From Swiss-Prot:
Any GO molecular function: metal ion binding
Gene: pufL
Protein's name in the database: Reaction center protein L chain
Biological function: The reaction center is a membrane-bound complex that mediates the initial photochemical event in the electron transfer process of photosynthesis.
UniProt subunit comment: Reaction center is composed of four bacteriochlorophylls, two bacteriopheophytins, two ubiquinones, one iron, and two highly hydrophobic polypeptide chains (designated L and M).
InterPro entries: Photo_II_D1/D2_sf (IPR036854), Photo_RC_L (IPR005871), Photo_RC_L/M (IPR000484), Photo_RC_L/M_CS (IPR055265)
GO CC annotation: photosystem II; plasma membrane; plasma membrane light-harvesting complex
């Protein structure tokens, strides 16, 4: 006679009733998102209101917070998209009926230096697109700061976004200024910018000799690996519904490698590796063509160190 398999006492009956309705809670007796959100839609506590004592943009559109910086970001998105779409899709040889993925917006010619192109001149559309994209990125970062202030959170999210934003600034603003010409900015366009990235490495002999390139790639790959390990562990342990779930996750990594960095630690470590990788990539780009013209010759100092004498 067949018998039903006995339940493991560590795995309680975790069946639950799903509350009907969009975005509803799955926890019995819990509150829906719609019930919770109003408590956190707090007026004030923004950078704009802290300076001017009033923020006319301190409101929400549905679940989305607007704020002054959200408004600034939307303005940047609208005008930046206009210049980009107009130049790469609506005009030029790569219009809609053709391969607009190959459309490009070239930076100003070298002879313009750090000047500003007049409307209709080469480089004008590039400068306008870069200007409004920079405004949009900065506004989005500051909007994240405002939301963090409202919720009394740390500033880890806007800092991480700001580090990604720094890569754009280095490529399109800081490095061109350091080299004295906007022409050193990268070409805008889906396929052309990939060609620019490929050619950039060859300009300085062998980019694999660039130590900051290696450190940046290591940081990005390591953060991906760390958070993939963390995500797979959480999914595996999610099958266990007991109160000791966190302990089980720590025990797993102690069994695997004798040490567990902990739930908070793995997020912190992935965060540090990710932003560290981008900051290293910033140096990788900034130093190329400015103080360093050839990354292979850059390593000549190693052979001239005094402790190699006589070797």
């Amino acid at each position: 006679m067949s018998r039903a398999k006995a339940k493991d006492p560590r795995f309680p009956d975790f069946s639950f009733t799903v509350v009907e309705g969009a975005r509803a809670t799955r926890v019995p007796g819990g509150r829906t998102i719609e019930e919770i959100e109003p408590e956190y839609k707090i007026k004030g506590r923004t950078t704009f209101s802290a300076i001017f004592r009033y923020d006319p943009f301190d409101f929400w559109v549905g679940p989305f917070y607007v704020g002054f910086w959200g408004f600034v970001s939307v303005i940047g998105i609208i005008f930046g998209s206009y210049f980009y779409i107009n130049e790469t899709i609506l005009k030029g040889p790569y219009s809609i009926p053709q391969n607009f993925f190959a459309g490009r917006i070239d930076p100003p010619p070298p002879e313009l230096g750090l000047g500003f192109a007049a409307p209709g001149e080469p480089g004008f559309a590039w400068q306008m697109t870069v200007l409004f994209a920079t405004i949009a990125f900065f506004g989005w970062m500051m909007r994240q700061v405002d939301i963090s202030m409202k919720l009394d959170m740390g500033y880890h999210v806007p800092i991480a976004f700001g580090v990604a934003f720094s890569a754009w600034l280095v490529l399109q603003v800081i490095r061109p200024i350091a080299l004295g010409m906007w022409h050193e900015g990268f070409v805008l366009g889906i396929m052309p910018h990939l060609d620019w990235v490929s050619n950039f490495g060859y300009r300085y002999n062998n980019f694999f000799y660039n130590p900051f390139h290696a450190i940046g790639i290591t940081g990005l790959f390591a953060s991906t690996w760390l958070l993939a390990c963390h995500g797979s562990l959480i999914l595996s342990a999610a099958q266990y519904r007991g109160p000791e779930g966190g302990d089980i996750e720590n025990v797993f990594f102690r069994d695997v490698q004798y040490y567990s960095v902990g739930e908070s630690g793995v997020h912190r470590l992935g965060y540090i590796f990710a932003i560290g990788g981008i900051l290293s990539a910033d140096l990788c780009i900034l130093l190329s063509g400015w103080p360093v013209q050839d990354w292979v010759s850059f390593w000549n100092f190693w052979n001239n160190l005094p402790f190699w004498s006589g070797v």
